[in-house]
Design a protein with these regions (language model features):
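Acidic, polar ligand-binding/catalytic clefts
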Residues: 1-49, 115-120
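Hydrophobic residues within well-ordered alpha-helices
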Residues: 1-2, 48, 88-90, 128, ...
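Beta->alpha turn/N-cap motifs
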Residues: 4-16, 38, 59-61, 81-82, ...
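A ligand-binding cleft/hinge motif common to bilobed small-molecule-binding domains
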Residues: 11-20, 69, 90-122
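Periplasmic-binding protein-like
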Residues: 28-39, 101, 105-146, 164-173
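Short helix-initiation/N-cap motifs at beta->coil->alpha
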Residues: 42-43, 77-88, 124
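Short loop->beta-strand "edge-of-pocket" segments that line small-molecule binding or catalytic clefts
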Residues: 46-61, 75-76
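Ligand-binding clefts/hinges and TM-proximal coupling segments of bilobed small-molecule sensing domains
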Residues: 62-79, 116-117, 146-173
Length: 173
């Protein structure tokens, strides 16, 4: 939007982006979790934000922004990609890998020594975004998204594409 490359898009809703983009209500949530080794002493979310805990995170991701705003003691180690963050974790350079549930499920499927901490630490809200300043378009799109969520279309689409276990539907609409 800022570069005038696109007018409308499916994008994660978050505070920094909301300065230049208007968002609809979310239509899907992508849960963000922490992954640890099964032998880790870190077993619950409350254990994560502690001195000496290192967390690999993809820089500038929506969950990186959330972690930056919400963690006080743990150290974030930023990587340029999920592959790089996964390597930091796999090579024992960090104690935790933060990521979106779909990617972490793939990691756990490939390594029985890894486990995901539940519940999620945050959810990335996927929404439709448009350039600020078009309230009529925003109202139309927001009503459309709310209808697609409430009438079950979004849920049916997730099931049809076999991603319903990786994503969730917002329940507050």
């Amino acid at each position: 939007v800022n570069s005038d490359v696109w007018d409308i898009g499916n994008i994660a809703r978050e505070t920094a982006r909301a300065k230049t983009i208007d968002f609809t209500s979310p239509y899907v949530l992508i849960d963000a979790h922490f992954m640890v080794r099964k032998n880790s002493e870190l077993r619950e979310l409350k254990d994560v934000d502690s001195v000496g805990t290192t967390i690999a995170v993809v820089e500038r991701s929506a969950y990186d922004l959330w972690l930056t705003e919400n963690l006080n003691q743990a150290t974030l180690v930023r990587a340029k990609s999920m592959e790089e963050a996964g390597s930091l974790f796999g090579n024992d350079q960090v104690s935790i890998l933060a990521g979106l549930k779909p990617a972490l499920l793939g990691q756990v499927a490939n390594n029985s020594d890894y486990t995901i901490l539940y519940p999620r630490f945050t959810a990335i809200e996927q929404a439709v975004g448009i350039r600020k300043g078009n309230p009529q378009a925003l109202v139309f799109l927001d009503e459309l998204i709310k209808e697609l969520v409430s009438n079950g279309f979004i849920e049916s689409s997730l099931k049809a594409h076999n991603v319903h276990k990786k994503l969730s539907i917002p329940s507050d609409q």
